[in-house]
Amino acid sequence: MHYLNISFSHKNSTLDVREKLSYKDDYATKGCLSKLNSGESINESILISTCNRMEVFCSCSDIASATKHIFEMLAARSGVSIDELEGRADIFDDSSAIHHLFSVASSLDSMVIGETQIAGQLKDAFRFSYDNGFCSQKLARAMHHAFKCAAKVRNATDISSKPVSIASVAVSKLKSVLDNVEGKKALVIGVGEMSEITAKHLLSSGADVYITNRTKHKAEKLASECGAKVLDMQDLHKAVNEFEILFTATSSSEPIITDEIIKPCDFDRYWFDMAVPRDINYHKGDRINLYVVDDLKNIVDQNMSFREDGARKAHGIIGRSTVEFFEWLNTLNIEPMIKEIYEKAFEAARIESQRVIKKGFIPKEYEDQIHKMSQQVLKRFLHQMSSKMRSVSEESKADMLTSAVQFLIEKDQRDIPDKYKCEHALNIIEGR
């Protein structure tokens, strides 16, 4: 079994390419995962699709075959040629795939180092795949340790001491190009985490914030939580020509702001499109200053400089965690564990046989017979247990079983995973 990761991110792919590769809804994601797992060499898969990356993480029996299948599937859907995809993609296998996963979970591979959104996005991607039957034991093991590694990085470094995200960087960019945000009308389109962060940053800067969404009650809920106002989505065509500031981050698969609704204005407009695929599609002009996620690189570079020391320390933690993960995997082999159980049982029988002979309870001439009989008794007793252990070794509950047995036979096994819902993910993201 191998781990494989194929990554398209802000590091190797333009926004245009990432748009074509993106998966914006559950239906499309489920279809992708189903096609991935239909490959003869792929047995589990997770799809991560955000504004800055689209990645396939899978377990497979053959790396070359799985890689070919993934590129063919992505090319057929996106319209991007296989040659271009192969030229852009970062491909990681086995230990490098785990190292990359840990880096992503710890936000070391993010455009904004230390940003807090990627952990939640990764958690959601894993939960969706797991709940729909596209991943199980092998990827759950890796995800469990990825979130455990992210917790170590968060606790041992300062890269997340001042939480940032693409949304907060976008608001910082706005404040750098607009002298004063206070009192200015700002429209936030969408109600996801990025929209919520944007609205809160704008409000804290004194902007007059309105929130709109296709589902009005969701906009009302977010506006109530933030202290913002609500704009009916039906009035979007008017708002784009009235608001000086606009941020959009929806999950729409098509642009929601196009040339047809944009009219000339006598004031400058500052628009931030943080969606992938993009929400705004228009021809330049009309005093509109449009920024997309890839335009925020300068601020991101400053962020990287500020967090450089913490990032170096984090890379060390990730390296050690990768080694520890594979060491842990090696302990999960069921056969050495069964062998050790038998050896401990036979040794206990031998010691006890010698004790009763030494005390004269049994004549010494019967020593061989007693030894053989005790071994036969133990073999009969342990046979059913060892058979059950072998039968569940490939099931999703295997790690719980092996960890518990390791604990009982006095191995150093401090981390006993409770289940494959990956409690580390929930604990880290929800702060429990």
Swiss-Prot record:
Gene3D superfamilies this protein is in? Glutamyl-tRNA reductase, N-terminal domain, NAD(P)-binding Rossmann-like Domain
Entry keyword set: NADP, Oxidoreductase, Porphyrin biosynthesis
Q: Where is the active site?
A: C51 (nucleophile)
- Annotated InterPro entries: 4pyrrol_synth_GluRdtase, 4pyrrol_synth_GluRdtase_dimer, 4pyrrol_synth_GluRdtase_N, GluRdtase_CS, GluRdtase_dimer_dom_sf, GluRdtase_N_sf, NAD(P)-bd_dom_sf, Shikm_DH/Glu-tRNA_Rdtase
Q: Kindly report, in one word, the top-level EC class recorded for this enzyme.
A: oxidoreductase
Query: What protein name applies here?
Result: Glutamyl-tRNA reductase
NCBIfam families cross-referenced by the UniProt entry: hemA
Report the record's Gene Ontology biological process terms: protoporphyrinogen IX biosynthetic process from glutamate
Q: Where is this site: Important for activity?
A: H100
Q: What does the sequence similarity comment in the record state about its family?
A: Belongs to the glutamyl-tRNA reductase family.
* Role noted for this protein: Catalyzes the NADPH-dependent reduction of glutamyl-tRNA(Glu) to glutamate 1-semialdehyde (GSA).
Q: Any further remarks?
A: During catalysis, the active site Cys acts as a nucleophile attacking the alpha-carbonyl group of tRNA-bound glutamate with the formation of a thioester intermediate between enzyme and glutamate, and the concomitant release of tRNA(Glu). The thioester intermediate is finally reduced by direct hydride transfer from NADPH, to form the product GSA.
Q: What is the lineage of its organism?
A: Bacteria, Pseudomonadati, Campylobacterota, Epsilonproteobacteria, Campylobacterales
For binding NADP(+), which residues are annotated in this chain's numbering?
A: G190, V191, G192, E193, M194, S195
